[in-house]
């Protein structure tokens, strides 16, 4: 059995390494040849996962054909805004009915498409079998083999059971959920809430504020999710509540760090000069316009959007949230 992992960021490298350590024939596609050579020659990904030596059994290449040819499973771990273009470039290397597991978190800008829609549209004619992997995970902690649980959203029971077995280890527990739409949306929207929580912490607003943002964040997830066909109950699970709590409270969260710096007075363009992929920045824009299109009220998302893209003062945004019309929970 061969597994092709597309994307060698921190999360892609961690998942590929986890699979290789378990004994699976795992091939990692690395976009930059220089980084690919480093991984091959030293066993380290110094750019995205510098603290961990990778399994000597992990194979990597910058040639997508070499990585994908003959693969039984395809794990997609590229930034959400680049998934469509990556699949367009690589479509020729997918077989018919490929087993595709997506671990990218986000909503596509301009189209408002979740990752499942991007995959189905990009691989039209190939009839992919689709699953989405999400949940409360920091790459660093999984690489350190700290106990971790995530969820696989998949409507195909056979594929769900296969992937669950492939990924499960003594330190990584995989649950399944047929609601892949809810699983993927939870993993995307929580990044917006993490930015909001980071800003609140940067403003020294305290634990009460953070708890309110997390709780009302779940409400926003559920409202948008139901409007897009997801089950509200999914957002109380690992990809919703679990991931939301982790990214709103954990210092390893890149989205929370962006919010923290904004709350401390830094400007977004300064923050983005750092080499960190904070999916929530683009996802905020995508979800803001998607919610307008669907007529779904997302007050936290709206204020985060105004801070990021209209230079609104974070403290003023929080005050505006608190002074909205009073209503039932």
UniProtKB/Swiss-Prot annotation:
Domain of life: Bacteria
Gene3D superfamilies with a match to the protein in the record: N-(1-d-carboxylethyl)-l-norvaline Dehydrogenase, domain 2, NAD(P)-binding Rossmann-like Domain
Catalysed transformations (reactions): sn-glycerol 3-phosphate + NAD(+) = dihydroxyacetone phosphate + NADH + H(+); sn-glycerol 3-phosphate + NADP(+) = dihydroxyacetone phosphate + NADPH + H(+)
Keyword annotations of the record: Cytoplasm, Lipid biosynthesis, Lipid metabolism, NAD, NADP, Nucleotide-binding, Oxidoreductase, Phospholipid biosynthesis, Phospholipid metabolism
GO cellular-component term (any): cytosol
Residues annotated for NADPH binding in this entry: 11, 31, 105, 139, 254, 277, 279
Coiled coil is among the record's keywords: no
Active site: 190
Residues reported in the UniProt entry to bind sn-glycerol 3-phosphate: 105, 135, 137, 190, 243, 253-255
Key word Cell inner membrane present: no
Pathway in which the depicted protein is active: Membrane lipid metabolism; glycerophospholipid metabolism
Cellular localisation: Cytoplasm
EC number of the protein: 1.1.1.94
Single GO biological process annotation from the record: glycerophospholipid metabolic process
GO molecular function: glycerol-3-phosphate dehydrogenase [NAD(P)+] activity; NAD binding
InterPro entries in UniProt: 6-PGluconate_DH-like_C_sf, 6PGD_dom2, G3P_DH_NAD-dep, G3P_DH_NAD-dep_C, G3P_DH_NAD-dep_N, NAD(P)-bd_dom_sf
Pfam families membership: NAD_Gly3P_dh_C, NAD_Gly3P_dh_N
PANTHER family: GLYCEROL-3-PHOSPHATE DEHYDROGENASE, GLYCEROL-3-PHOSPHATE DEHYDROGENASE [NAD(+)] 2, CHLOROPLASTIC
The protein, known as: Glycerol-3-phosphate dehydrogenase [NAD(P)+]
